[in-house]
Each structure stands twice: as structure tokens, then as C-alpha cells.
């Protein structure tokens, strides 16, 4: 029996039928005889216009126009029908079954049957028919189809018109019920009626018409006779069918079943579906049954349909009401579940919450700061303990309950309540909490977030959100009820998830199952049904909120939720109106009963930043202009965008498909100017100054339309694009061409708004660029006033410059008010190709000599981009590098293949996500010869290839060999390759081992290798060099090394005769450095190791981190204090209080500093270098500044950091931060930072670097901003040395450009990546929760990295780790010890804990939500020995943001020392405080190898300046 929709054969039209006699609807124009009246379709009508329906009157016309996909062997037309209505002769919509009692007609859109995707061929008809019969198909497929037949064709009903939808949908559900009963009885004819109804209800549970499975069952019973007749009709058309529906006892029982509430449907139409014959429905009507009875039955069914619709609307209104109102929980109803009344007592002094925050502003609740509250308690205005439940779980207006709280506030540490912990304690806390005792203002709402196996409870005041840690012992009994209710909700989740259909469990079913829980179950309430139901209803708001947050839609809308909401509605409690607006006004008074008690001043308040007036003005003026009110929805969207950009959680942000990483998207194409059609007088004004290189006369001045244009001035040129502002160009020189045209050559002066600083730029400042062009003087539209500005540099000139700038701004404002032209100034060169702003090349601009430095740069770039032979054809130029025979070179690895010559491809190999497995370093080769192809020898641009011999690396042999070998070791071979010159990627050195630098340090920044072994690739064996083989090694060019070799390393030429490392510089010759936001000192350590910095002062707010800094930098003066206070103290000491913008609190704290502290403060002129990374609180996903309010931005520490730079005016300034710093707050913070440094007078360079490419085994992108005084040289970016797969370092620039700081190393780098085994493979075994600080190594270091990171250490410190709770430890042991294993590899089984509780080994919550969260990859994950460690965070845990934290072979979380090594800290580096403090110090640190690489480039810049000065 073929019943598939669209393939069922239909009956053909009998040629003897007199279709001309059929009844027609009143609106239709009848065509009486199709046979006698030929159909003529005009040429215009033959083609249906795309997306435009044709309207026709005759059915036959519609059939002909939609015949494009008609099957020739189908005797009867089949069509699709959409947007249709079945109506009577008066045009009134009618149910399909009404066909039994009268004539039914059709209107709609007819389409070809087989062309589902093509809706352009539809033909609309107003009305035709009549409808002869209808039938249901799709029984075998399980997908019902409704077919309607007229005398001419059969129509597959797809989509009804909107006005007909409700009527048709009801009939379609009847068809669905028929198909589901057919499916169930075909599988099991002997099933019971209850089982049949349950099966059908499960299958139809997705329907929006029914509220629950019970409603579906009632509907199926009401349609019993209808269903019986349809299936009985199948017996007649499918006689060989194994199931006999007519005599099936269950189907007969369904037909005869009487419902006390709903009258049976009375349609006894049986349809026969046959390939050869269809029986009309009216043939099956029992003639004995009176027509009025049949009509009454149909009317009754229509009333039933309408009643169902009303019920559905009522449910919808109930749901809508639940979104408008919050049902208040009365305290007396839940009193039995709580302890007897008790009062809050605390002898400790508590600080008013309002002192930590600044009240009085309208803020969005989503922008409030988030803190953690430990050791907390809640109470009312009488200090009586009170439950959280009396508070709303949604923001409500005018709540009539007052709840306050107290506790120890600390920075948000992600605390939560572990569901596996029987004591309702957090899994991430110690008993001692750092923070301060406070009392809260009125609590307005609270929420529960359900995250896998952690519960996060958060409450909100008007000042902040507080994530709750462990409650106080006094309050713990009041909180236990809340946690128990959470466990009840989670138990219900588990019940529902175990069902194949969640609709199977009604509210009553769930209550019964809760009664059956064992007494030792954490969700056990009672065995009595009434007690359980009372508990669930009175605590229903907690349960409903958890269901609302659950990601599974079916569970969210399950019958249990509907039933519980209905029960809560029936209680008739007070309803609070839910607030739609998220904005709140922070009040300035705290009504907490503890407000009358004495309190202390807090150090934790986010103090308004202490700033200089210059920085305050720049940021304040910007926010006075660009702080429009942003709708809360828009703010939310911005936040979501920024969260998605957070590279800290994603190791594979984008797929770069370029084979060669491009440093920057260059653009030297100048703006095209538009010629001037006006006639104006143009003549030279002055004598000839000289000639161009082409012999054309040069002039210094010209008169253009009465205006004087001079070399060194600025002119306006209109551009082709009318939407762009006119371009301003700096005049380099003017000349008269050979065809007597007066010409000008100039460089583009870019407006600040068109640079990376955007709207933060000063509208009067222009930036010189390297974009130049030559135009006719007649194209000039005018001149502008331009001042090539120069200011004396240094802290001693700061006040003088401020006065001059103030007068300049006043003059500009006056000119603007009087409508006078803008006077521009220029003091910097903007180079997007180099990612920065540089001092003007004053010696090369405005000379009028015919020379243009920009043209020279373009010529050099074009020359570098060429690949060509040298003149003697014995060498190669490629990418600006000249290669000669005998040179050691880098080759892209995808050019070296087993089958010889094969051009590289940009297609990326399949890699394990984020682990660098599969990435290869450059292949080191020696250039043997340049082969010029024979056919191109005579051509000027001859084609050529290079012949190379290959060196193998240890990793080419095996993983074990790579692990145990020096990363700079190579093996010579006889393998040769002939490759295109594009494969070459640079030069390196290969030396004998005893010619290597004596002091090789980590990280490696030199391209030097050594070779002393031969590798036979044919046998795979390593051998000593054959006696007859002569390998020409690199020549040693390092004079220091030559002296060392000659003197055997005893002396290096110093007068003292003390042995000194080649790169070591005495501290007195280094830059005196002030490290702000110093942390434990990772940045300072790397810079000092590079030999460029001497950290004399450090400022760190957190005491444990400050102590760690002091331990590792004992000579530095460390201020463990707020940097705002320190800056205020310095400015007071120097007598510059008038220039200091700070709070009264900062001044009071300065007064409390002792004289010893004040005497050690750094002063302007003493610090050559300021470095640091401002806290990221403002740049994280949860911040209080995203609304752009200036009053809130003033608390950003970035302002204080920039003010240090302004006040001290050091030679160099370095800012480090997370990648998101560039995009935070729509990029405004980044732009204002750049604008501030430029306004101070600095040269500025910006970029993003990946620490993993500098020798650490973890991905860690950092934004770096360098600033150098106008007299210094800006450091270049360090070259990435290790392959690492973590792209995403591009910074977007205006005009469609982007800046790539350094090349991407995914396709090759000088060295391989550092692996997990390299990093931690030598560390001894430790157990879960290890706390012993000092240990023995027990083994010798194996890898090159281990040898460097250990140094001379004999005692291993801080190889300690956090402890896993019992369940997580069991899970850890069950995670397979193989690469990439995580929670998905856990067996699906239960485990019994020591307390007797039975828990699921595989977290159910993860299993059910995996599809929406990238499979929760990495949670409970094991590290891969050959991969990299995850991003170092402040609190590693298996359910954290970086869940891959299990050791590759041991059953524990990675230790403090292992995390430190992943950041590149040497084993000698000490950390301070608890295990948690140490993880925090490491997670917040700058990787020392990255700092070392930056320091080396800074040292090069200093040497370059010294060299330039020596030359001059």
C-alpha cells in the first residue's frame, strides 16, 4: 500500500462525467464545456513572472499553468495547494467534514507538486470546485497528509490561509491521531487502550493545541469513531495487511468508549485509499441516519474545537500574567520548614555598603559590579533572621518586604554551591576569607543559576550584585531549606530527563514520585502526598525559576511546570508587578538597622581615580560629548558582542587560511582628487630653487586663485567620493612639468577621526602619512592653516606646556565662535602599516628639493616584494632578503614532502583543537645552488629554482627524541630538494656545538642552531659525521663570543675582570623602572632578565601579590597600597596638588602614610620607564561602566595609570592588557588611551601578541601599547619564535584596513611549540590536595625547557594542588588517561559515596545541555602530553571556564608550580599566601618570556638611538 504524500495514485476523470452540470459558487464564472471550448492561453499568460502570482478563474487553466513538473505516466493531475480556504457557496469558511452535508468549494494558490522549493510558479484562483472528497495519506511514513479532490485534479494541502488556519489545524490534529494510532497498532496490535492512549499522547506532545498529555488523551477518545472509520477503510484497500483494524479489540474499544465530559465525534466517514480506485465519502454515509443528526454532530464538534481554543487562550493569558506579576511567598506558609525565630548578632565592626560604591546615579542593573559575599546572613529591620524566599526572584516594583544582609565582601571569585557536597558549602573556598565585613542596603531581588553541578545564588541591592559563598554558621539553617528546594528541583529534572517524553509526567505524577524517594536522598521531603505537595507549592518560586533557566525547551514547558504554576495561582497571594525597565536610581541612604552602629573606613571602595588635569580633561570632554543615553537593549547587545570576543576562553578564535601571515593590510593608494573646472589664475611666486631628478624646475611658492601656496604648507583637495570630506595634503615640493603644467607633490594629512583613535581624536590635530600624490595646482580648492608643532619634552616642561596648550585651546574656541576657519596642527606621523604614531621626520619633510620619503618607501617596498636573481645569478632576492649559496635558510614545511617537489598549499591540516598537534617548525636547509630554467635564461626576469639540502630536527625523528633533545639541535642529511624561491622564509645560522653562545638563555630569540650528527633518512639512523663529509658552518660574527672562545670564557673585557653574560648590562646602566599594578612581578622579571630594566619601585594593591613581588625583587621598594593614594602622595610631595584631581578619601589616606613611606616615593625625573597592566574589571563581561557614564569611568584605573605617565613623563611607557581591551566599550577606552598618550606628547605603537609564540605552553593573547618620548626610538615588535595555533591578533583600523602585529606562526616558525611534557614531565608525582610546599625533584630534567626553567634549583617549591571532592575525584580517576579525554568519556553509571548517597558518575546536566554548549568540550578534561596547557586562570577547576585541568597521567588538578611553568616562571620564582592566592598571582601575571621578548626589543631601540647619536 503506497501512502506516501505526493506519490499516491489518484483516480482519473471519467470522460462521461458531465462536469458542466456541477454546481458552481456564486463568485465563480463557469466554463460549461471544456471539451467543446478549446483552451487558449495568450503568450503573455504562458510565463508566470517571478514572485508574482497569476490570478485565474478556471481550474483547468490553473492546472495547465502549473504542469511543468507533471509526470507523463500519471493519468490524473496532482498539485500542491497553499494559502487555501474551504468555503460554502456564500464564501463562509467551513470544516472539511462539512462536505457530507453540502457543497464545498476551494480557493488558494496552486503549485506544481514536485517543485517544493520553487514558489514562483504559483497560480491563484478565487474559487472553483466543488470538492468531491478528501482523504488522509502518509500512514506508512508516519507523517499525515491531507488530500482534497475535485472532478479535475487531486490537491495536496500544504498551508492554509491565515483565516482558515484554526479550522484546518483542528482537522489536521485528527489526521495526526489517526496516523499515530495506526503506527501504534501496527507495532503492537494487542496493546491495551491505556497504553495506546499514552503512546499517542507522547507522539503528539509537541502540538500547541493541547496543554498536556491528558488533554491529548481526551481528544483521542473524543475522536474514537472517526479514527476507527479511517483505519477500517484501510482494510478494504489493503487486504494483505497483517493487521485487521475492523476487528481490532482496542480500536473497537476506542470507538465505543464514552466520555462523560466530551461528546463523541460523529463523523463515520470511512475513506478508502487505493491506487486504482477511490471511494467518495458520501458513498459511505449511512442512509438511515437523518441529515439533521449528522449536522448536529458536526456543530457539536465545532463547539468542542472552539472550547479548546478558549482553553488555549486562557493558558496563554495565564502565561502572560506570569510574565507581568510575581506571586509573593508568605512567610507564615514556609515557617514550618525553617528554624525558630532568631536574631542576627555580630560583634565585628561592619562597613556601610554605600561606602564601597558611589550612590546617587541611575544605572542599569546589568551594569552593577559583582562581588562575592562570604559568611553572610539575612535579616529584617528588627534584625530577625529571614529567608531569601520572601524576596522576589525577579525585579519588582514597590515590594512590601524589607530584607537586609551582612557578610564579608571580596572580589568575585566564582563561588558556587556544589550539588555533590552534602554540607551545602562551596567547593572553591577556604575557611578564611579575605575581604571586609559590611552590611548591605535593602536587598531587591535574588536569583539562582544552575550550572552543571554547581548552583550559583546571587542577590542584588541597588549598589551591586553579590554572589553568595558559604553562609555564616548562625544563618546556615535558614539557607539549608533553599538548598533543599534546589535539590528537589534537580531531582525533578532527573525524573523528566529519564523519560522518553517529558509530557508523560504530569504534575500529579511528579508529586507521587517525590513521595517515593528514599529518606537518605538529598531531595527527600516526606512520604505523605499532601506534605510533599504543600512543600513543592509553597517553595514553588525557586523551582519555577530553575525550570525557566533550564536550556531544554521541552522541560521548560512540561505539564509539571504548567500544573505547578496553576497551583500557585490558586493560592491567591499578593502579586508584585514585575519591572520591565532595568534602570534603577541608586539611593544614598542605607536603612539597615546596623547603620546606626560605628563602622570602619574601607580600602575596598572603587575609589575615583586620581588623575592629572590633562588626563581628566581629555576623558571628561570626550564623555561630555559621546555619552548619549543608550537603550538597555542596545547595551545588552554590546555586552554580548564583547563577551563573544573574549579570547581568554577560546583557543581557536578564527581560521586563518593564508599560507603566509601578512603583517598588515597595506594601503598606499592615495585619495583620488577631483579636478577643478573653474578658470583661475595660477603662477609661480619666486625663483627656481632647483630641479627634480627628471630635470623639471622646482619652485617654493605659487599663487593659486589669489592664495599663496608654499612648500611646507597645507592645501585642500576635493575627492571623487562626494560623501567623503575634502582631503588635506602637506606640500612637499612644487614643479613645472615638461608639458608646462604647474604641479604639486604632497602627502596626505589624515584627520584623527580617520585613524585608529577615531572620535577620541582632537578635531584640530592632523597626522602626516606616507600616502602621497602629484596633482595639478589648478585642482587645489584652498589652503588651510597648519602648524608643525613642537613642544619641549620632559617633566620639567609639563606646566609650561599646559599653559601654552590652554591658551591655544582658548584661541581655537574663540575662532570657532566667530566662525573663522580652523587652525590645524601636526606633530606626529601615522603609519597604519607599522601600527603606530611616530615623531615627524622633520629633516625629510617640506624641503622642496624634489625628494619624497614616501615615494622612497614605496619604491623600497616594491623592490622587496620582488623575487629575482642577483646580477651574477648566484644568489636570490626574496621578500627583501638576499640569499647566497651556502646560506642556511628556513623553508615552509608544507613544501617539503616525501615525494619530492610539491608546491605548498594554504589548506590547513586537521589539528586537535587548540593543541598545536600537527604544526611544524620551519625546515632548516642549506642553499646549494640556484637553478635557472633553460627556457628563460635569456629573459630579463628569468625563472629559477633553488637547490637545498635538508637538516632534520629531533621532532622529525620521534616524539621521544624531541622531548629529550635540545630544541636548537639539527641533524645533517643528504636529502636534497629543488623548490621555488617562494618557499624560503629567512636565514639562520648553523654552528658546531662548541661554537654556540656560552650563555644560552630562555626564551630563545636568536636564529642559531647547532649540528654534530648525521641522519640517514633511508635507514632512520643517526650517525657521526662521515670522515669525508665537509659541512661549512656559519661564521661566528659575535666579537664577544670570539673573545670568550679565545679566552676560554674567563674574561669578557670588563675592567674589573668579572665574568659577565654577553647581554647582561649593569643595573646602573638600565632604565629605572616603576611597575604599577605589579602583581607578583612577571612583567618586571622578564624585563629585568632582558637586561634593560631595573625595577626600583612597584605598586600593588593585593597584599599577597605585593609580598611575592618583594620576595623576588628584594631591592625594589614595594608599595602595597592603592595607586590613587600613591599618585596623590607624590604630587603632594612635589607641591602639585593644584594639578591633582582626587577624592577627599585619597587625601585622607595620604595623610596617614608615615614619613618613611613618603621618603621612598619615586619622583618625576627618577623613573625612566613606567610599565604595568591596569586591572581588567572594567574590561570583563560583568562591569559597571558599559553605559559610558563619565561618573563611572572616573573609577577606571586606566586613568590613574595614564596620569602617572603624564606626571612623570618617563622615556618609555608600557601598557599590557587582555585582548578585549581593544574592543571594550565600543573601542572607546582603547582610543582614549591612545589619544591621551599622543596629547601628552608620546610616540605610540599598538599591537596584540600571543605569548605562546615566545616559548610558553599556553595560549595567552595580550594587547601591548608602547609609548616613547619624541626623542627616543619606539621599540619594534619581537619576532614570534615558536609555532602556535592561536590566531586572532588583528586590530581593525578605519578605511577597511587591519593591522597584524606579527606574522602568524601556524604555518611555520623557527622552533616547535613547547608541549605539556616539555613543561611538566619531570615533576614528581603528587596526590590530590597535596599541600607540602618543599619537595625533592627526584629526577633529572629531560627536556630543554625543563633544564632552563629549573636553573640551579635543588628544592622544588609550590608543587601543591587544590583538593577535589569525593565525587569529582572518582570522576577524575575514571577519565581515561589519553589525549583529549573529558567528561564525555565517563561511563554512564552510578557511584555510591562514603556517606551512602548514590550519585550519577556522568553529569546529567552536561549530557542534556551539551548540544547548546559545544559539547562542553574540555570539562573534566585531561591534558595532552603533546599539546599545550590551557589558559592560566586564577582558579583552575574541572567545572570552571577552563575545565581541562587534570594531569595527563595523575588523578588530580594541575599544581601551582605546573601553572607557573606554563606561564614561563622559573622554578626559583616564589609565590605568597594560600594556594588560592598563588593561583591568582600566576593567573593574573604577564608571562615572563613575553616580557623578556619585549625587553630585548626595548634594548635594541636604546642601542639604535645611541648608534644614531654617535653617527650624528
From Swiss-Prot:
Its EC number is 2.1.1.37. Residues 1-22 have a biased composition (Basic and acidic residues). GO terms for biological process: DNA methylation-dependent constitutive heterochromatin formation; methylation. Residues 638-662 have a biased composition (Acidic residues). It catalyses: a 2'-deoxycytidine in DNA + S-adenosyl-L-methionine = a 5-methyl-2'-deoxycytidine in DNA + S-adenosyl-L-homocysteine + H(+). NCBIfam families: dcm. Maintains chromatin CpG methylation that plays a role in genomic imprinting, regulation of embryogenesis and seed viability. Required for proper patterns of CG DNA methylation in dividing cells. It is found in: Nucleus. The active site is at residue 1176. Belongs to the class I-like SAM-binding methyltransferase superfamily. C5-methyltransferase family. InterPro entries: BAH_dom, BAH_sf, C5-Methyltransferase, C5_DNA_meth_AS, C5_MeTfrase, C5_meth_CS, Cytosine_MeTrfase1_RFD, DNMT1-like. Expressed at low levels in vegetative and floral organs. GO terms for molecular function: chromatin binding; DNA (cytosine-5-)-methyltransferase activity; DNA binding. Transmembrane segments: none annotated. One of its GO terms (cellular component) is nucleus. This is DNA (cytosine-5)-methyltransferase 2. PANTHER family: CYTOSINE-SPECIFIC METHYLTRANSFERASE, DNA (CYTOSINE-5)-METHYLTRANSFERASE 1. The gene is MET2. Its main location: nucleus. Residues 1-35, 634-678 are annotated as: Disordered. Keywords: Chromatin regulator, DNA-binding, Methyltransferase, Nucleus, Repeat, S-adenosyl-L-methionine, Transferase. Residues 707-841, 909-1026 form the BAH domain. It comes from Arabidopsis thaliana (Mouse-ear cress). PROSITE patterns: BAH, C5_MTASE_1, C5_MTASE_2, SAM_MT_C5. Residues 1071-1505 form the SAM-dependent MTase C5-type domain.
